[in-house]
């Protein structure tokens, strides 16, 4: 499911941009299908999918498919669709302008007539779920809205006007080692973040990284999660996906895991330093043979002038044995990256874990509000957190025990003391530390960008302020605690923690200040007087 912004095609289309003597232009189109052609045992039904026309001849209407499983607003009521930015195998990307703000975005439109199989529909759903799951990371293209009508699914996302990283490589031939180290640190940081959140990209290549600003090589955004999947630690995948130059050998052997993303990143690093891929041939079959053979050329120019440390990192990222290959967080600690001044000691993107820690310091009102917000989110927005819960809930009971949480954190690369895990258990389960239920886990791990959305904040406030007075009182909070089976002790203290003007109740501005303030500690900052408005002055929920 290719994506596109300015200055080139992104995603599934490949335009043979490497120098001719070093490259082969494999068949334009979806690289996912190209890889299937390599596999002689691939089921015939998948190689020869029925066309939309053949479906229509059988009396079926592909436009009747409900991809999102819910009704959405009309895209054109909120956005003006502009010029075409590019064309992919499954969708077309357009420039669009939000009517209310005048802000420009990219809108990827996927016609339903191209969603021929159940797997095609699931691929689109999963792509949207993963984009929501990863939203908020500064180096991942932000998803803004998703719409569906009778003809298509429309994904509105951040507009990246700087073009492709691939184009920058082509323009410069190869980067200095310092620049390459800076770029690969960002790319591998994205990979490490994805893996820590239980996502495997499966199609890493320069074309799938965009620049927000054409003058800033470091303004990188990862795009195109059409082949990405959720995974659990130790899970083995067998589906042949990816792009020939960047595919790992274990993918061709149909037995792989997230280590394959590190291989692809290693190929990107080789390209960043030399301008050509390490494995190439005059045919697609030849490329695969070269990948399986695994010989890396460090003799041709410019490699004699490149440091041994850089070559050491490439060798360790392109180790043929996945278990011996560096993990993403280990790449970030390699001496070559450290020597270039952009190293990090971060072994795991802490987004989910830090939210769990913050949750342990949160008052009951904020916890309740997060539960309300979590219940309002669509399935695709919480799908990633659901998969993480399932990975920890090994017995499929819908609850997590102390031991399961400790083991799950360890498998995701996080080390906590038993006392810290106990604090998390106690906080997330409100009043005891025996188990964490699914709903409590979702509320505790909501990303900040979900919490701070105006419509979610207003809906949560309205949940407490059922009579519409514009204030949350002790009585209202007591009723809410009862509805969620939470202990209602210390409610007056909870009110006083949030009540900034000491009138014994919480207005909308104070509620927003609590939700948007620091989650650690309860000393909320006083809001500016311009924000000190009651609910009656806040935007209305539609």
Curated annotation (Swiss-Prot):
The lineage of its organism: Eukaryota, Viridiplantae, Streptophyta, Embryophyta, Tracheophyta. A lipid is attached at residue 2 (N-myristoyl glycine). Belongs to the protein kinase superfamily. Ser/Thr protein kinase family. CDPK subfamily. The keyword Repeat applies. It is found in: Membrane; Cytoplasm, Cytosol. It catalyses: L-seryl-[protein] + ATP = O-phospho-L-seryl-[protein] + ADP + H(+); L-threonyl-[protein] + ATP = O-phospho-L-threonyl-[protein] + ADP + H(+). Residues 79-337 form the Protein kinase domain. The active site is at 203 (proton acceptor). This is Calcium-dependent protein kinase 7.
